[in-house]
């Protein structure tokens, strides 16, 4: 592809020991001749002077030249590595611009060039930004896995399987004499079921990767005066919510964003759930349910002094029955300082149950470890791949088309409609890696990158 020659500072703005200027495009060699007086040997570090148009030395440092397509962007690339003073770097960029036909790079444009030149796919390009923005070791490991192609590999395997099945179905439709009763002999059904199972696994991994990157939304819910606001304060490490003995003190949604060992956690404190005629409180309860329905996890707060039950169905069946079927729930028996309960975690009917005292902090550290575990924190293991919300949406869309295709096969034996659903599934998956992606989406993704990346 033909691209502009672009330049940008690749290191962070400000004062530092080393500053790097990156140039990419067909005029990179012209810059080398103008600024260095010669073209460095490809892929070799060359210590030399960086000179102005009049021959004065601007700085001294190392020059690296990469001949396209054997470079990060796929274009000719020149890197000038000098001293990290911002004034010096600005002077050097100004000198590069004097060569002519060169412009300042837009945010993420070097990565965009690499994507357009097939040096990496879209998930790998996004992983560069995620690696830079990682807030914990787990996120960095996961981003690196994506950069190395782990996520792309999973998606490509799915695309290949869907494509092969689609071609088989279409061929059998076009040449019916070659395949008798091909829709009912079980071959297509078995292949389709395997793809659905594979996609389920990828979706689960992507959801975990998204939580590591974007954080987990945890909603604290329960009856009034169960200690929800006290737990919010204990997790946040500060007095974010007003705590009183008066039931219904919290009437609106309170939010805190914290990090557990660098992993982002979005905690939502909600109004106590109960039947009430108070209009303001009713609005707060409605907002509480809105937050619950969009949560990744619910901490069901129970006042341990009011019941000895641990099974949430026994504690409050109407509340549990109203929860989304796929929403994870952790039961928190609060006020252990008053009940004298042992601070231990138990499993009850598939629910994790923790005994704590939000007021004194007893058991809160164990609860934090539980939340870290839910977010995929692993202290000694390599991370899985990282994922973004758009990836989850594309996977969900692909899964929907597979389910529709399954219905066309099992209920209607409609080969043409099955093939169409497989085609739509293929398109949804290909959007993840950027094989079929709108220019608007590409612009949105790369514009969020750092300049110089």
UniProtKB/Swiss-Prot annotation:
Enzyme nomenclature, EC number: 3.6.-.-
Pfam family, one: MMR_HSR1
Top-rank lineage group of the source organism: Bacteria
GO cellular component: cytosol
Amino acids binding (6S)-5-formyl-5,6,7,8-tetrahydrofolate: 22, 79, 119, 453
Keywords, ordered alphabetically: Cytoplasm, GTP-binding, Hydrolase, Magnesium, Metal-binding, Nucleotide-binding, Potassium, tRNA processing
Binding site for Mg(2+): 229, 250
Residues bound to GTP: 225-230, 244-250, 269-272, 334-337
Location relative to the cell: Cytoplasm
Record note on cofactor: Binds 1 potassium ion per subunit.
First-listed, main subcellular location of the protein, grouped into a coarse class: cytoplasm
Role description: Exhibits a very high intrinsic GTPase hydrolysis rate. Involved in the addition of a carboxymethylaminomethyl (cmnm) group at the wobble position (U34) of certain tRNAs, forming tRNA-cmnm(5)s(2)U34.
Protein name per the record: tRNA modification GTPase MnmE
Gene that this polypeptide is encoded by: mnmE
